Each structure stands twice: as structure tokens, then as C-alpha cells.
Amino acid sequence: YLDSGLGAPVPYPDPLEPKREVCELNPNCDELADHIGFQEAYQRFYGPV
């Protein structure tokens, strides 16, 4: 399936994207994610991914 504008394949939707966005909106979670990775940071703030 091709994107109508760019002619490039549409990337597979990331099931973790909504959680990644939640973490990015929390400055503390976002900063921690830069050091230890998104999934580990998310778990520390919000519980299991």
C-alpha cells in the first residue's frame, strides 16, 4: 500500500506509540527515556508497558 502523496510505503503502526507520546509529554519520563530507553522509563512512571 502506497501513501497517496509521497509514494512511499506507509510505516507499520507502532502499538507503543500512544504510550511513547504519554512519556514524551512528561518531562521527567522523557528525560529518563533518553538515558535508559522508553520502555524502561515508561514502566517506572506508569507501570507495565
Curated annotation (Swiss-Prot):
Residues that, per the record, bind Ca(2+) 2: 21, 24
Residues with PTM 4-carboxyglutamate: 17, 21, 24
Protein family membership: Belongs to the osteocalcin/matrix Gla protein family.
Residues annotated to bind Ca(2+) 1: 17
Domain of life per record: Eukaryota
Localization per Swiss-Prot or TrEMBL: Secreted
Organism: Canis lupus familiaris
Function (record text): The carboxylated form is one of the main organic components of the bone matrix, which constitutes 1-2% of the total bone protein. It acts as a negative regulator of bone formation and is required to limit bone formation without impairing bone resorption or mineralization. The carboxylated form binds strongly to apatite and calcium.
Protein name as annotated: Osteocalcin
An annotated GO BP: regulation of bone mineralization
Principal subcellular localisation of the protein: secreted
Modification after translation (UniProt): Gamma-carboxyglutamate residues are formed by vitamin K dependent carboxylation by GGCX. These residues are essential for the binding of calcium. Decarboxylation promotes the hormone activity.
Gla domain residues: 1-47
GO molecular function: calcium ion binding; calcium-dependent protein binding; hormone activity; hydroxyapatite binding; structural constituent of bone; transition metal ion binding
Entry GO terms, CC: collagen-containing extracellular matrix; cytoplasm; extracellular region
PANTHER family: OSTEOCALCIN
Keywords: Biomineralization, Calcium, Disulfide bond, Gamma-carboxyglutamic acid, Hormone, Metal-binding, Secreted
Chain positions of site Not hydroxylated: 9
Binding site for Ca(2+) 3: 24, 30
S-S pairs: 23-29
InterPro entries the UniProt entry points to: GLA-like_dom_SF, GLA_domain, Osteocalcin, Osteocalcin/MGP
